[in-house]
């Protein structure tokens, strides 16, 4: 149910059934106000651990905590009426054991009310994904470039250029599908490989830096809106440039405060006559 309890939101089963129908529209969301703006237009909203970089200024997603993800998941859930909401499991919250993953995934679902969790990993995480899905936890898989592993993967770069890399990602995708994931995020791979994976698996692929042939697309909302300026990946398109708009608005506010023209009479309360 939605935050108002009046409408039904998309389920993970409905997202899975969208494969081969129409493209799945996805974006990241971290706060209630942004979730409200995105919700009417999106099939799925991801409370991504990218919030560590976008909101908190971290250099990577590694420093994000479970408590941070739960707090932002709660905020996003207050703003949705339609979209399926998935919460990222942060680094260190699921890699130790499948039991640890289940314990923390259940905490996310119970404390946020979200529809599922996302975790990174391929063949090495398939047993964990199967353990979760067998116990009622919907899992959104993630293969290709994995930001939580960037420190050991040689940085941010497109993967699958070599046959060895491509074959590993193919095996990863198949393993996560067979483990019971309802969808698969494919990140930072060469276009032909993402296209091939989309055709070879029976669950939806949602691409970021992948291929237009994927069953859906996702971007970090702050990237898409032109709000995050630390760096711009090749795969990002700015559908708006809000950073200059915000800067100009703050500049105008500052000038009016200094000139004592704000607040004006229309912004203040007067005694009754």
Swiss-Prot record:
<keyword id="KW-0479">Metal-binding</keyword>
<dbReference type="Pfam" id="PF02548">
    <property type="entry name" value="Pantoate_transf"/>
</dbReference>
<feature type="binding site">
    <location>
        <position position="118"/>
    </location>
    <ligand>
        <name>3-methyl-2-oxobutanoate</name>
    </ligand>
</feature>
<comment type="function">
    <text>Catalyzes the reversible reaction in which hydroxymethyl group from 5,10-methylenetetrahydrofolate is transferred onto alpha-ketoisovalerate to form ketopantoate.</text>
</comment>
<keyword id="KW-0963">Cytoplasm</keyword>
<dbReference type="InterPro" id="IPR040442">
    <property type="entry name" value="Pyrv_kinase-like_dom_sf"/>
</dbReference>
<keyword id="KW-0808">Transferase</keyword>
<comment type="subunit">
    <text>Homodecamer; pentamer of dimers.</text>
</comment>
<dbReference type="GO" id="GO:0000287">
    <property type="term" value="F:magnesium ion binding"/>
</dbReference>
<keyword id="KW-0566">Pantothenate biosynthesis</keyword>
<feature type="binding site">
    <location>
        <position position="88"/>
    </location>
    <ligand>
        <name>3-methyl-2-oxobutanoate</name>
    </ligand>
</feature>
<dbReference type="InterPro" id="IPR003700">
    <property type="entry name" value="Pantoate_hydroxy_MeTrfase"/>
</dbReference>
<comment type="pathway">
    <text>Cofactor biosynthesis; (R)-pantothenate biosynthesis; (R)-pantoate from 3-methyl-2-oxobutanoate: step 1/2.</text>
</comment>
<dbReference type="GO" id="GO:0005737">
    <property type="term" value="C:cytoplasm"/>
</dbReference>
<feature type="active site" description="Proton acceptor">
    <location>
        <position position="187"/>
    </location>
</feature>
<protein>
    <recommendedName>
        <fullName>3-methyl-2-oxobutanoate hydroxymethyltransferase</fullName>
        <ecNumber>2.1.2.11</ecNumber>
    </recommendedName>
</protein>
<feature type="binding site">
    <location>
        <position position="88"/>
    </location>
    <ligand>
        <name>Mg(2+)</name>
    </ligand>
</feature>
<dbReference type="GO" id="GO:0015940">
    <property type="term" value="P:pantothenate biosynthetic process"/>
</dbReference>
<dbReference type="GO" id="GO:0003864">
    <property type="term" value="F:3-methyl-2-oxobutanoate hydroxymethyltransferase activity"/>
</dbReference>
<feature type="binding site">
    <location>
        <begin position="49"/>
        <end position="50"/>
    </location>
    <ligand>
        <name>3-methyl-2-oxobutanoate</name>
    </ligand>
</feature>
<feature type="binding site">
    <location>
        <position position="120"/>
    </location>
    <ligand>
        <name>Mg(2+)</name>
    </ligand>
</feature>
<feature type="binding site">
    <location>
        <position position="49"/>
    </location>
    <ligand>
        <name>Mg(2+)</name>
    </ligand>
</feature>
<keyword id="KW-0460">Magnesium</keyword>
<dbReference type="InterPro" id="IPR015813">
    <property type="entry name" value="Pyrv/PenolPyrv_kinase-like_dom"/>
</dbReference>
<comment type="similarity">
    <text>Belongs to the PanB family.</text>
</comment>
């Amino acid at each position: 149910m939605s935050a108002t309890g009046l409408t039904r939101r998309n389920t993970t089963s409905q997202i899975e059934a969208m494969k081969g129908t129409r493209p799945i529209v996805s974006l990241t969301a971290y706060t209630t106000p942004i979730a409200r703006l995105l919700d009417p237009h999106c099939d799925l909203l991801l409370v991504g651990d990218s919030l560590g970089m976008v909101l908190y200024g971290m250099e990577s997603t590694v420093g994000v905590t479970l408590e941070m993800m739960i707090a932002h998941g709660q905020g996003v859930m207050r703003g949705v009426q339609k979209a399926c909401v998935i919460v990222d499991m942060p680094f260190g919250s699921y890699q130790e054991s499948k039991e640890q993953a289940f314990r923390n995934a259940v905490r996310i679902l119970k404390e946020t009310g979200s529809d599922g969790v996302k975790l990174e990993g391929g063949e090495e995480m398939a047993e964990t994904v199967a353990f979760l899905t067998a116990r009622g936890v919907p899992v959104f898989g993630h293969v290709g470039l994995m930001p939580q592993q960037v420190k050991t993967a040689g940085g941010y770069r497109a993967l699958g250029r070599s046959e060895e890399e491509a074959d590993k990602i193919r095996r990863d995708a198949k393993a996560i599908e067979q483990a019971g994931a309802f969808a698969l995020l494919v990140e930072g791979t060469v276009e032909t490989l993402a296209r091939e994976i989309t055709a070879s698996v029976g669950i939806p692929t949602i691409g970021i830096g992948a291929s237009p042939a994927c069953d859906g697309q996702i971007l970090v909302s702050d990237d898409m809106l032109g709000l995050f300026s630390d760096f711009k990946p090749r795969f990002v398109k700015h559908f708006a440039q809000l950073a200059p708009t915000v800067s100009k608005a703050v500049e105008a506010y500052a000038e009016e405060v200094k000139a004592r023209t704000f607040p004006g009479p229309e912004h203040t309360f007067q005694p009754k006559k």
